[in-house]
Amino acid sequence: MVNLTPIMIEGQPFTAVTVKLPKTNFMAVANDHGYIMCGALDVALLNEKLKERGIVAGRAVGVRTIDQLLDAPLESVTYAAEDLGIKVGMSGREALLKMMK
């Protein structure tokens, strides 16, 4: 099952996506500029193979809900995210707000 939910963070619009699969869930929160995602995101692939695309993304591990994804510290971020001031260790929520600038 796929669930798309509009959410607001400090008055800014985002879309939360949850994909329920057998034995696992994929979760992401996105806007037009970038996204954060659960541990399934391969940041190394985005940085190495797709660097020219400038994908703004961050990865949080060990999360099971959208709220946990928003509150969890990012374990890794893309080079393009770093260029916006998004850093490893900041919360998903904080990273998303930096994507608004």
UniProtKB/Swiss-Prot annotation:
Protein name, entry field: Uncharacterized protein YunC
Source species: Bacillus subtilis (strain 168)
